[in-house]
Amino acid sequence: MAEAGGAGSPALPPAPPHGSPRTLATAAGSSASCGPATAVAAAGTAEGPGGGGSARIAVKKAQLRSAPRAKKLEKLGVYSACKAEESCKCNGWKNPNPSPTPPRGDLQQIIVSLTESCRSCSHALAAHVSHLENVSEEEMDRLLGIVLDVEYLFTCVHKEEDADTKQVYFYLFKLLRKSILQRGKPVVEGSLEKKPPFEKPSIEQGVNNFVQYKFSHLPSKERQTTIELAKMFLNRINYWHLEAPSQRRLRSPNDDISGYKENYTRWLCYCNVPQFCDSLPRYETTKVFGRTLLRSVFTIMRRQLLEQARQEKDKLPLEKRTLILTHFPKFLSMLEEEVYSQNSPIWDQDFLSASSRTSPLGIQTVISPPVTGTALFSSNSTSHEQINGGRTSPGCRGSSGLEANPGEKRKMNNSHAPEEAKRSRVMGDIPVELINEVMSTITDPAGMLGPETNFLSAHSARDEAARLEERRGVIEFHVVGNSLNQKPNKKILMWLVGLQNVFSHQLPRMPKEYITRLVFDPKHKTLALIKDGRVIGGICFRMFPSQGFTEIVFCAVTSNEQVKGYGTHLMNHLKEYHIKHEILNFLTYADEYAIGYFKKQGFSKEIKIPKTKYVGYIKDYEGATLMGCELNPQIPYTEFSVIIKKQKEIIKKLIERKQAQIRKVYPGLSCFKDGVRQIPIESIPGIRETGWKPSGKEKSKEPKDPEQLYSTLKNILQQVKNHPNAWPFMEPVKRTEAPGYYEVIRFPMDLKTMSERLRNRYYVSKKLFMADLQRVFTNCKEYNPPESEYYKCASILEKFFFSKIKEAGLIDK
């Protein structure tokens, strides 16, 4: 950076050598990687802001601002023109004795005297900074902040491969360089003369309008849940990384690239780059862009968000998992219709005034999305309402879902906190990158070969057709019940009568009076299946929370609507409803005609709960068989068949990839023709080349005595912690120091956590211990650039670790 040109057209120093694109050529020796736009995937990414670069820049700025004034003047002199003589054309002071290698930090460098001569013009440093003699510390700190931003952008210019992005980086580089020379504030001009907001209504206002338009009629608790979903969506847009125009041109050649390029440039200048260069004013994407940008990213963003949600579901609390996996897809589908609709009212300029006349809800206060966190789903989990008879339960309502108490301040629930995110990974697992690559193929219709899949295949899941109908709004599910405490709702009463008729018609051996008594009993509830406004099926049940089970009394679907998957989907909704209410056991008496159905839904004649729990509570039926079903709270039952299908597709694609890698083809086995019934797997020709390993062949070297293993691992871990290069890995990475770290690193690990695990006797084998410590090094190298000090520490410590486990005899030397 010491060779930078003047204000009008700064000349960049030569680019790093071809073989080292990540080499940083800044005067400060920054180890920060470039901004998030440098690693944009072909369809955009949902990574956290700055990729950790913003934290590193903030640390360097704090260090520099706390330095002595002489050090600050030296730094600013590099970017200040010489004023000794009018004829001197030197644009920046050059240190005559530059360090041969970048030191560990700026503050460790020797402070240069103001009388030190410039290597270029031979004038003193004082001649370059004479205009800064009477400048306040506050102004000097502001200029120093711009200096570090310039150096960071300089790195980005050289590292960026996309021409459009590089051009924007270079423009901002020149803008900030000029601001330093002229001591002014950077103002984006030129082709970007239009100032934010660029379109009205904004994305935030449009989503506000959408919530008002679609959900204002709901009770406050149900509406609050929708608001939480909207907050999650807006938060993700604010940290969404747009794909470069060149990538979009390849993916969608028929799109309006010129319009997208304009929005992309604005997004870089006003939203993205200011995340890590805070000398530029920053705007939230949702506040300055509108429908046009949202349309260009919504489809791919929706797909990736849902996929990421499914991948991270195990990290989420039960309530939030149900909210995200069950209700977030429905929310996005409804919003998608309004985004691409030509006449949706949510994008009208006068929607605010029109809605204020019809709704008591203040549209301005519906959603106020925070831009403080980068977790994928930052909305807090919500509480549940005990269902009152005579009203529909939001627990199974497709348009809303869970409820949250209005007016109650919810604490931030960091689902990606370090403690929660520490998940052990199975040894030999398939790399996440490969899974994501396969997922992008099987979820992208353009990437799949073969016939169209508009129609259901012969091997579709039983509930697939019903699930599709629910998404299209053809069918609905509502938990209903009678009430003695309040005036019954007319619609609910009509549905209860409809349920009575369905049960009576489909269960002719059951007395009609008995059916009527139970359906209208306030202690019983019914999950009703509604199609075209009328009841076509349902499951009547009674919950016993104190006993930990629910009794299923009636279950039926009208005869002309059977064999469509409604029964399976109905039961899956009932399972998810009970998971929300933390009741994980079903009991029912099934007659000879119903046993087959209940077996398909996971029921068994083996009852898992003690007999004392249900005797005297459940109704006994002569000639019927008692069956039970235990629910797994980690399974999203309404999407379970989709997940299984997706897993099968992934395995199939992975097998195809492996087959393509194996060039040699072996003849088929002929031994079975000779009467051989069985052969060892390892004797199959080519089996080892596929990556298969015999489980019994690897002789473990680890000590058989648990105490001996504990002592050995404790000794190794202590030596690793005492190593001089172990300092970056002693504690979990803090979010404040590295924003976006837990978006990049899925399985964090540190030496403190390992010490706790060792103390709790978690490491029952050497493999678990080695996997955790290897994860420490892998995470560091994945997040930090190769030339950074953290990366070097990880490499040195990794070699030391392997030398120690070899000395301990845990692996072959």
From Swiss-Prot:
GO biological process, alphabetically ordered: cellular response to insulin stimulus; cellular response to oxidative stress; cellular response to parathyroid hormone stimulus; chromatin remodeling; gluconeogenesis; heart development; internal peptidyl-lysine acetylation; limb development
Top-level taxon of the source organism: Eukaryota
Broadest EC class assigned to this enzyme: transferase
InterPro entries: Acyl_CoA_acyltransferase (IPR016181), Bromodomain (IPR001487), Bromodomain-like_sf (IPR036427), Bromodomain_CS (IPR018359), GCN5 (IPR037800), GCN5/PCAF (IPR016376), GNAT_dom (IPR000182), PCAF_N (IPR009464)
Keywords, ordered alphabetically: Activator, Acyltransferase, Biological rhythms, Bromodomain, Cell cycle, Cytoplasm, Cytoskeleton, Nucleus, Transcription, Transcription regulation, Transferase
EC number: 2.3.1.48, 2.3.1.57
Coiled coil: none
Domain spans labelled N-acetyltransferase: 484-632
Compositional bias annotation for Basic and acidic residues: 406-423
Catalytic activity: L-lysyl-[histone] + acetyl-CoA = N(6)-acetyl-L-lysyl-[histone] + CoA + H(+); L-lysyl-[protein] + acetyl-CoA = N(6)-acetyl-L-lysyl-[protein] + CoA + H(+); spermidine + acetyl-CoA = N(8)-acetylspermidine + CoA + H(+)
Residue numbers binding acetyl-CoA: 555-557, 562-568, 593-596
Listed GO MF terms: acetyltransferase activity; chromatin binding; cyclin-dependent protein serine/threonine kinase inhibitor activity; diamine N-acetyltransferase activity; DNA-binding transcription factor binding; histone acetyltransferase activity; histone acetyltransferase binding; histone deacetylase binding
Gene3D superfamilies: 3.40.630.30, Bromodomain-like
SMART domains: BROMO
Location of the protein in the cell: Nucleus; Cytoplasm, Cytoskeleton, Microtubule organizing center, Centrosome
Pfam families listed in its UniProt record: Acetyltransf_1, Bromodomain, PCAF_N
Any Gene Ontology CC annotation: mitotic spindle
Catalytic site: 551 (proton donor/acceptor)
Compositional bias (Low complexity): 32-46
Segments of this protein annotated with the region Disordered: 1-55, 380-423
Disruption phenotype: No visible phenotype.
Family from the record: Belongs to the acetyltransferase family. GCN5 subfamily.
Quaternary data: Interacts with BCAS3. Interacts with SIRT1. Interacts with EP300, CREBBP and DDX17. Component of a large chromatin remodeling complex, at least composed of MYSM1, KAT2B/PCAF, RBM10 and KIF11/TRIP5. Interacts with KLF1; the interaction does not acetylate KLF1 and there is no enhancement of its transactivational activity. Interacts with NFE4. Interacts with MECOM. Interacts with NR2C2 (hypophosphorylated and unsumoylated form); the interaction promotes the transactivation activity of NR2C2. Interacts with NFE4. Interacts with MECOM.
Protein name, per record: Histone acetyltransferase KAT2B
Natural source organism: Mus musculus (Mouse)
